[in-house]
Amino acid sequence: MRTLSQVDFNAIVLQIDIKPRLIKDLKFARSTSHLSAGWSDIELLAIEDRTGDKGVLLIQPEDKLYAVQYELSRRIVDSRTGRDRAIICDFCYTWQPGSGAASITFTHASKKHSVRFLCCADLACSGHVRTVTKAAVVSRAHLKESILNDERVARLKTRLIEKINDLGLEAV
């Protein structure tokens, strides 16, 4: 992902359709503080509000950057047992236990519709496909997956492009 400053991010936010109340709650500095040198290995980045459950997801699978408002639900409950359910992320194909699972809802304020996907609760899919997180190591063992990190990154980019097309997003 290209390196962004607070000014760049503010310009992006003005280009997309976001609820005004969310704009003032977004925490760009807190959401990007861990990226001091690593912007190039990021395909998606969540800029969260103060609660961490809403925000703007920046997506850059190739050259173009996309942004979309999201809401995260960190509990996926099995209707039969009442326990948190494990999932496989729709973006990075990482297996997540119930404590690491979430569903993400993308909302278009002007179009009055939303789309929901299963995802990693930390939205660290770029790190998961590169096997730099503990969750990625556990997932690879659990799924008995033997493909290389480069192939996982390519798969993530392909899935992100599919989701961008499903949502009808335009580059910012």
Describe the residue ranges of each PLM region.
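Short flanking/linker segments adjacent to small metal-binding domains or redox-active Cys/His motifs
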Residues: 146-172
